[in-house]
Each structure stands twice: as structure tokens, then as C-alpha cells.
Amino acid sequence: MSSPQHVIIGLSGGVDSAVAACLLIKQGYHVTGLNIRVLDTPEDTPTLAPSAMRISDSEEFDFPVFTLNLSAKFARDVVGYFHDDYLAGRTPNPCMVCNKAIKWFGLFEAMRLLRADLVATGHYARTELRDAVTRLLKGVDPEKDQSYFLWMLTQAELAKTLFPLGGYTKAEVRELARSFGVHAAEKKESQEICFVPHDDYCAYLANAIPGLEARVAGGEIVDQAGKVIGHHRGYPFYTIGQRRGLGVSTGEPVYVTEIDAEHNRIHVGSKADLECRSLIASGMNWIGIATPDKSFEAEARIRYRDRQSACMIEPMDDNRAWVSFREPKQGVACGQAVVFYDGDEVLGGGIIAKVNPEAPPQKILG
């Protein structure tokens, strides 16, 4: 009789990862927990350390847990990226980057060190092996589906990853937590970025980057004709689609339509001016399909809570893609991800590099 497969499960301290661990044990896996530390004092050489962390008082769900301090890597790859994107006039998505650079990096490092077979997380997503390809699918709960944040994962990573919660709703997970005696069964979810206090990114940036406010204050706010209609506190403190706090009066609502970091300038316009009919995405990662060499139709999401919309994707050189939408999208921000779907399956995605390019791409592959 073969021994059970050994799974490293990422534990955040919340209800989802705890229930995922319990389900793996119920399914017969040998489970080891990994709690990744990202806000501790950095270590020169991160090592696995035993932890007293327990998710339940039940002996059935008592399993070894280790911690891994990745604070230095987190500061560089996630916090540093967050700062750089705002300073470049983009809108970053740190949770998306953290999944790839921290969570899966740490899980695979623990899998290597502990000679385990698989890794698992509490994300609401699914995988399916079809035609010798591991497909990434949406979770069945449309309110909790987290597939949008996982587009950066590769075939090698997905083939070794389990998502125990993908077939459950959040309400069902809460009920399972209570039945398993999970300590975090009633713990509220946090929607905040873990290193940004009170989810106030403006105050955070002002404190985290010395001299930022003095350096960027007083830039111009211009309308769609280029006319100066006011001044702002600094371009990093604004986001695409923002309406409140602009301090300008035009007689009708205006929204941030463009952030020009080079000239410390904010462009504003009407809601119609926020429409995006096409974009260029860079850093493409294709999951369930080979890198395309000709245009094809799919559906796209340009933010986490966005609905899937029909689009045409045209591959470009330098691992980019031109994306045109059948119906215009609202408030598309550079720095966010555009993720492509075929129904429930994630095909891939990329980072939005340019919104409403002036002309169709000149160099298309194929």
C-alpha cells in the first residue's frame, strides 16, 4: 500500500486556509502547514522554523506547521513594486504579485526542503487536467472566485497545486469550519492590503517615501482640451476614475482619465472619456493554451470584480497583446491586470501597459 501524498498547505490564520487544510486531511493527504511571514524583521537566509500554530483543538486536525520569513523578498518584490508603480503613474495590484512572488515561491521552497509532493492554498479556484494540460478554472462561488489573481501561475506550478475550496461557496466553508472546530470559524475577512494601514494608500505612500509630497505637489489638472483648470497634491495620490477630492469646479462631474507621471499632470474628463475600447497588455502569461500566433476571441476582466466582456486578442511582439473590446470598458488603469477567459477557464493574462492606443499594432505575430 502506497503512503499518502504529502501536501504543503499555506496557512494565513484565516478561515479559508484552515478549512482547506482540514479537507485535505479528510481526503487522506499527509498535511504540513506553512505560515509565510512577510512583515517581520528580515532574515539574511530565510529558513523553515517549527511553529506552535494550530487551526483547531481537534486531534484529527493537529499537524506540523512551519514558518518561513520572506520579509526581505516581500519588501523588494511586493512593497517595492507597489511604490514603483505608483511613482510611474500606474495602479498596482500587490495581492496578484504576492501570490506569484511570495506565496507560491514559499510553498515550492517548503515542498523542496520537506520533500513533499504537492502544495495547496485556500484560494477559491479550481484546476482540471485535460488533454495533458492543467487548466485553471474559476471557483464555483461567483462572489468569491479568485482566479483573476492567479493568472501569473505557470503549468509547472499549477500541476503541483491543489485548491480544496474551489468547489465550495463561502457559506459552505463557514459551516465546515464550525463542524471542524476551526478557531477562525467566525473570523472576519480583511479586504485591506496587509502593509497599508486602514487601506489608506495615500497616507501610506506619504509616510513610506520621504519627501514625496513636497516633490510632487502643485502639478496641473487639465481638461481634455489641455486647459489648466486646477492643481493637485501629487499624481501618485490619484487613481483612474476618481471623482472625489479633485478640488476643481467645472459645472459637471469630472473624473481622472489619465495620470501623466513624467509631467506630474492629472487629466480629467467626463464619464464618457473614461471609456476604453482597446489596450495593450505586456508580460503575457498563457496558462491553458500555447502562446498564440494569431488573433482570437475570448472574454476579459480588467479588475477583480469586473464582469467578463467579449474581446479580440491580437498577439504582438515582445510578449505583448493588443486587446479590443466589443463594448467599451470603464475606468481601465495601467498597472492592473487584464485576464482572459473561455467560460470558466483562465486562458492567461498580462499587465495593462497602454489604454486606447492611437493606432492598431504595426507588428503582429503570425
Swiss-Prot record:
Classification via InterPro entries: MnmA-like, MnmA-like_C, MnmA-like_central, MnmA-like_central_sf, Rossmann-like_a/b/a_fold
Transferase listed as a keyword: yes
Keyword terms: ATP-binding, Cytoplasm, Disulfide bond, Nucleotide-binding, RNA-binding, Transferase, tRNA processing, tRNA-binding
Alphabetical list of SUPFAM superfamilies matching this protein: Adenine nucleotide alpha hydrolases-like
Any one GO molecular-function label of the UniProt entry: tRNA-uridine 2-sulfurtransferase activity
Similarity comment: family membership: Belongs to the MnmA/TRMU family.
Name of the featured protein: tRNA-specific 2-thiouridylase MnmA
Record organism: Chlorobaculum tepidum (strain ATCC 49652 / DSM 12025 / NBRC 103806 / TLS)
